Amino acid sequence: MSDDSHLETKVVTDGTTGEKKTISYEPCRVLGSGSFGVVIQAKLVGTPGFIAVKRVLQDKRYKNRELQIMRAISHPNIIKLIAFFHTHNPSKDETHLCLLLEYMPETVFDDMRWYTRRRKSIPNLSIKLYAFQLFRALAYLHSTGVCHRDIKPQNLLVDYKTGILKLCDFGSAKVLVPSEPNVSYICSRYYRAPELVFGATHYTTKIDVWSAACVIAELFIGRPLFPGDSSVEQLVEIIRVLGTPSYHEISVMNPNYVNHSLPNVRPHTLESVMPHNCTKNAMDLLHKMLTYVPSKRISAIEVLTHPFFDELRDPNCMYHCSRDEGTIERHLPPLFNFNLAELSIRPNLNKAILPPHVYESLDVDINNFEPIVVKQADADS
């Protein structure tokens, strides 16, 4: 470590217990920046690894949704909030929120780029690993009432060596209340569900499923599935693959949508745009996720039961990252260490999700347990 003059010492609030404590960290490098603020990598004194520090400007008119939600949730495939603190600049009358977060070395976007630059495809097993962990995180998140609203490759942190994935960036996340409207211009364009493109303000967590499906397709293709440069172009891209939605489908997505003059585009099929390494099971799963009517779109917990993931349920399955030199094989990262809250989401699906060889390692008897009501995140956000 360099000299102590680079250290920043702060009184922070623990992200789990709420207790105050003093920590010191040394900023290392900028990981990302944008309208939201900046994220840096830092070395936390007294620990062997790194953390990420996210600094965002506070709007005094609102509680910070991201902080509220991150304090309310906890999951192996969601980035952990270690601690947080506020800073105030009197001269500018500005307050910033600083989140100290678990650090991961890359994003799914970075991993994809490594392969595409070498004109290679991400191995199917890696796609299955990333997809399973993403939908496991979403199944838990949705069970708490929270919708992420910005699923994209840049918000999926990974360690390609171990295959572990964690969902991050809850800056757009919100507890969805059925009776309350939401903004429709949410989510990065390539990953926006069609009901959002049609301007719906009453939508469900199924928008995350659509976005995640777009990410899975992109992992196979190596580029975005629906790369629209505007809202109209986004709709054209979707119609080009899935065909024109019927008036009934449009009215279900947004009953208030009145402009029924849709682009006249000659449709392809999903099969025609997906590469040869996209298996029959993968194609079937994509079809179940990429449907216009949200209620017909498969849910995140249901996705986990799909045969596409059966290879991961094989106790002899080993993970080999083709980015590694040599032929290092590793055991899969923990995929089935479901806690009681996860087992309680849809108890009737547990045996379709979890392979028999993990039953004994669970904290509960999968054949005889009392499901709990999953704690809902605070909607006052």
UniProtKB/Swiss-Prot annotation:
UniProt-annotated catalytic positions: D150
Entry keyword Kinase: yes
Domain Protein kinase: 25-309
Record field: catalytic activity: L-seryl-[protein] + ATP = O-phospho-L-seryl-[protein] + ADP + H(+); L-threonyl-[protein] + ATP = O-phospho-L-threonyl-[protein] + ADP + H(+)
SUPFAM superfamilies per UniProt: Protein kinase-like (PK-like) (SSF56112)
Modified residues (Phosphotyrosine): Y185
Pfam families: Pkinase (PF00069)
CDD domains: STKc_GSK3
EC class name: transferase
Protein name per its UniProtKB record: Protein kinase gsk31
Species of provenance: Schizosaccharomyces pombe (strain 972 / ATCC 24843)
